């Protein structure tokens, strides 16, 4: 069940959903807007001949931060990691989906490539996978609205929520845009 604005506010007021910093004006009819932080992870395309999700490649990305009040420029065809300004914390019986903002999508900005789902129990900044599909560069201003979180009520609490010992939960508590840790639990079935 998708939560309405009334239900979102009630979950935040009860302390079950934490959004820090919280701005009540960001609550929409069935979502809550999130803003862009000021840190970006850009890919160092010359460090490796290819990306291998089975292998740790620590120099694949590096963190950059725009100076002062400057924007980050995302060029056509470019892909970078960023994160929400807000820290998001979910209880064991709510999951979330990060969706892009329609107005930004109409400019060619993709907010997340594939990983828009946030498990119950997650706590941290949400990493964004930003791509520019437009033919012109896009200015990304730290603090601008970048997406919206939709909250979903589970039929029951997760038995093993994100952050529990059963799962490695390698992104729990992440700060800023976090590089892929796919090598930590890489699985391949012989076919």
Curated annotation (Swiss-Prot):
Keyword Isomerase among UniProt keywords: no
EC number(s) per entry: 3.5.4.30
Gene3D superfamilies from the UniProt entry: 2.70.40.10
Organism: Streptomyces griseus subsp. griseus (strain JCM 4626 / CBS 651.72 / NBRC 13350 / KCC S-0626 / ISP 5235)
Key words of the record: Hydrolase, Nucleotide metabolism, Nucleotide-binding
Biased composition (Polar residues): 171-191
GO molecular function: dCTP deaminase (dUMP-forming) activity; dCTP deaminase activity; nucleotide binding
Gene: dcd
Pathway of action: Pyrimidine metabolism; dUMP biosynthesis; dUMP from dCTP: step 1/1
Name of the protein: dCTP deaminase, dUMP-forming
